[in-house]
Every structure is written in structure tokens, then in C-alpha cells.
């Protein structure tokens, strides 16, 4: 089974379209896993959501921006750690978000667990400690971003029972293998530091 991983589209429709066109043209990808933060930062929210919710080969989870924006939509407490930098922007996104996407966004899970080729695979936007998996976004469940190295990854995801952990959030491509678990971040589709849209 071959699958593709996309994450952190952040409202960048052109980048998303480029990546999905490449995936579709390959004709050897069975499934796409979308690791969240589809909205926020970029302005093409509804075009992005229309494109991803229209596909039947994609499973997705929520990222911190998705949840924070929906907290504005739902009138629930907003996370303090994002207030200074993103609150006004998230209000703008929420004000332009088509109501037809509310239910689907509110129902996105925080993680997906699969067994693929005999290996336990965890898809998650970023580490959330097991005792915070059901905490609301204003309780800041996502762990602080750590340095991209093997030791930091091992400590960060120490509570997770998986052979392969696939995540996004920090927009940087990296892969580490500590002999017990493998950690893979494909980089951000919509906020890559280079001129190309990336996926895994």
C-alpha cells in the first residue's frame, strides 16, 4: 500500500492543488492522510476545504489553527498562546468561513491510528500528551515545538505506542529513527520555506 501525507496547507489553494495534481498523476497512491492546519494564515479557506472534503481517498485530522478558528466560530474559549499573534486573523477567517464546513471541521479527530504492513502508524498534527488528548484547544493541548533532532523526538513522543509517527505543525521536513520508533514530518504544503510545495 502506498499513501501520501499532506499537512499544513494553511489556506494556500495553489500549493494544495499542485500537490494533489501530482499525487493524482502518479496513479500509485491508494490513500492520502491530511494532518491538519488546512485553514488559517492563507485566505483561500473555502476553496481549500471544498477541494479536500470533496475527496473520498483522504482521511484527515485537526490541527491547532483549525481548532482555534472553530473556537471563534463556536464561541468557545480561544487559546491564550495564539491570542497576540493570530486572534484577529482567525476572527477574519472565521467570518469568511462558509457555514457548510462547520460540522465537518468540528468533527475532525486529533489523531488516526492504523496498522499498515504490520506496523503501528500514528498520524497526528503534533504531540499531545495522552492525558490531554480530550482537552479543549484553550487548554493548549499541543506540546511546545522542540528542536529537530532524534533525542528531542524520542522524548517528545515517549508516551505514544507506535512504530511510525507522522506529524506536521512546525513546517520543517525531517525524519529520524531511534531504533524503536520512526518519526517523519513531510514539511508544510502551504508554508514551505522554499519555492516548491512539498508532501510525503
Task: Label every PLM stretch briefly.
Residues 55-113, 141-158:
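Active-site neighborhood of divalent metal-dependent phosphoester bond hydrolases
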Residues 1-58:
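N-terminal active-site segment of His-dependent metallophosphoesterases
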Residues 1-4, 113-122, 178-182:
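Beta-strand-turn-beta hairpins that frame and shape the catalytic cleft
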Residues 105-141:
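Internal, conserved structured core segments that host functional sites
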Residues 147-200:
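Conserved beta-sheet core of the metallophosphoesterase superfamily
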Residues 38-48, 65-68, 171-175:
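Di-metal (Zn2+ and/or Mg2+/Mn2+) metal-binding site signature of metallo-dependent hydrolases
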Residues 6-7, 32-37, 59-64, 124, ...:
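Active-site neighborhood of phospho(di)ester-bond hydrolases with catalytic His/Asp-centered motifs
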Residues 18-21, 47-50, 74-77, 137-138, ...:
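Short, glycine/charged-enriched secondary-structure capping and boundary segments
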